[in-house]
Amino acid sequence: SIQTSFPVSMELFTSYREIATDQSKAGKVMRTILMRLGSEVYEQICLAAASADEDRGTAIYYVLHRAFWGGRCEKRVMEALADPYVSRVAKLALCVKREYHHYFGFVRFREISGRFLLAKIQPGNDILSLMALHFSNRFPNENWVIYDEKRQKALCHEKGKECVMRKGVRIQVPGSTVGDMGEYEELWQ
C-alpha cells in the first residue's frame, strides 16, 4: 500500500521505502492530470489527497492507473463508481469538500495586539491549503493566520500578498494580547 506517513506499527515480512517528494515530477503529474483527464478529475484527486485516510495514496494510485492504463486517457474515470478505488476516492473527496465548506462558515478570527487576525482550527482532514483562496479573497487587506493545531501548520496572509504555508509551527496565545510579536512576524518571512 502507499502511505503518506510512516506506519505506527510495522508488519512482519513487509519492506518499507521512504520516497522524497520531487517537486518537478509532482508538477508534471499535476499538468498531465489536468491536460489529459480534466479539471474535475484533478479536483477529486486533490480533495482525496487532503483526506486523513491512511489508504488515500493507494486509492489515488489505482484510480490514476485505471485512467491511464494502456496509454488511454479515461476522462470519465470518476464515473466508474463500481470500481472500489474510484468509489473510495469519490467518498474521500466528498468528505474533505464537506469539511472545508463547513470551515468557511465557522472559522473565527480574533485580533492579536491590533496587528493581525488569528484563527485556530482542528480539522479532521488536511484542508488548510484548500482554504487559502477563499480567505485571501475574503480578507485581502488584512494580515491573518489560520493555524491547524493538529498538524502544526499555519496558513499566513500578509496584506496585499499571496498566502504562505508554514509547517512545524507552534502558536500559543495565553491571553487576548501577545507581548513578544517576533515569533509571529517570522511566519510571514
Residue ranges with predicted function:
Residues 1-189:
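Extended, well-folded catalytic/binding cores that form a central cleft or groove in large enzyme
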